[in-house]
């Protein structure tokens, strides 16, 4: 499924797909597994190639770990004056494993430029008029490749679509959660300004733009059971938090792009040089090892089977 084909079909505008190619590139450097760099082939003649893996020091991940430890570590405390509120917030963060996940997603923010935190309600008790009487609060963590801004102002994202991929019975699905502002009125028709509305849809990841599931279809899938198609928050405050590095985005020709950039976005050449020289240094030891020269008649036994391991570089 091409999610940008889906957005085009639905008439949804977001950031150009080329920027998400850059996010994928940053992620590959973060994982030290860049196509056509860490994975390459060596030609041995007569049409034979050998697949090789270039060694890496993993410096992209290392600098992301370092900035993460500076931004959110065990010395950070969240202090709220009201004790009841403080206790409630601590319980929500503990349930979301924020001490661990928060630090990890600071690292992912440094790696790809942007992350998001999306609180949501579960185990809700709802009144007849649709208002929520009680519920538990949980927290979703979203990486950059699954964040699609649809409206922004002065680099502040005001409307956004979050993608949550799931696999069920070997079929891939994605929940698209669209947070957008709509006019808000009370029951008497009085204008209350704007409120955030959350629209959910589930798409089966088939070829092209995918296939939209009906609410009845997605409720049959455990991951999406009970998912509401539309939620009116009754608030003008965004029900999500976008977290990005305080670094200007200079990798996109669109200067208004509200997404962040990787900590090492402008140092790819440096990372490549480090890994190239480290790999060359390691190869010097491999190529400098002792070699044993063997007569051709000693390479096979009486039945013609090879005696030595052809992958053993000593012989």
Feature map (PLM): residue ranges:
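Extended, helix-rich architectural segments
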Residues: 1-162, 168
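Acidic/proline-rich low-complexity IDRs
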Residues: 2, 11-14, 24, 56, ...
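Intrinsically disordered, low-complexity segments enriched in small/polar residues
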Residues: 9, 43-45, 56, 95, ...
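Compositionally biased, low-structure terminal segments
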Residues: 5-8, 20-21, 38, 99, ...
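Extended, regular secondary-structure scaffolds
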Residues: 103-106, 116-256
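Intrinsically disordered, low-complexity regions enriched in Ser/Pro/Gly/Gln/His and often acidic
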Residues: 1, 19-23, 145, 177, ...
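Extended, charged amphipathic alpha-helical segments
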Residues: 217-315
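Short linear motifs in intrinsically disordered/low-complexity regions
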Residues: 3-6, 14-17, 28, 67-70, ...
């Amino acid at each position: 499924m091409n999610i940008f084909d889906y957005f085009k079909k639905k008439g949804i505008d977001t950031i150009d797909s080329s920027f998400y190619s850059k996010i994928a590139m940053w992620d590959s450097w973060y994982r030290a597994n860049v196509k056509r760099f860490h994975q390459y082939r060596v030609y041995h003649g007569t049409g034979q190639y050998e697949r090789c893996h270039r060694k890496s020091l993993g410096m992209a991940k290392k600098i992301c770990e370092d900035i993460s430890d500076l931004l959110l570590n065990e010395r950070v405390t969240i202090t709220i004056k009201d004790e009841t509120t403080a206790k409630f917030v601590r319980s929500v963060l503990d349930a979301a494993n924020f001490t661990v996940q928060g630090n990890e997603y600071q690292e992912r923010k440094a790696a790809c430029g942007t992350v998001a935190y999306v609180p949501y309600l579960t185990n809700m008790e709802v009144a007849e008029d649709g208002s929520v009487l009680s519920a538990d609060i949980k927290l979703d963590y979203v990486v950059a490749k699954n964040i699609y801004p649809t409206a922004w102002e002065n680099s502040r994202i005001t409307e956004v679509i979050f993608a949550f991929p799931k696999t069920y019975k070997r079929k891939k699905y994605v929940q698209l959660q669209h947070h957008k502002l709509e006019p808000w009125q009370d029951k008497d028709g009085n204008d209350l300004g704007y409120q955030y509305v959350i629209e959910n849809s589930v798409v089966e990841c088939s070829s092209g733009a995918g296939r939209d599931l009906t609410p009845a279809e997605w409720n049959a899938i455990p991951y999406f059971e009970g998912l509401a198609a539309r939620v009116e928050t009754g608030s003008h405050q965004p029900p999500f938090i976008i977290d990005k590095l305080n670094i200007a985005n200079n990798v996109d020709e669109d200067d208004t792009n509200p997404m962040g950039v990787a900590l090492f976005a402008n140092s790819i050449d440096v990372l490549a040089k480090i890994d190239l020289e480290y790999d060359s240094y390691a190869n010097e030891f491999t190529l400098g090892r002792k070699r044993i020269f063997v007569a051709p008649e000693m390479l096979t036994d009486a039945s013609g089977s090879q005696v030595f391991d052809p992958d053993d570089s000593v012989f």
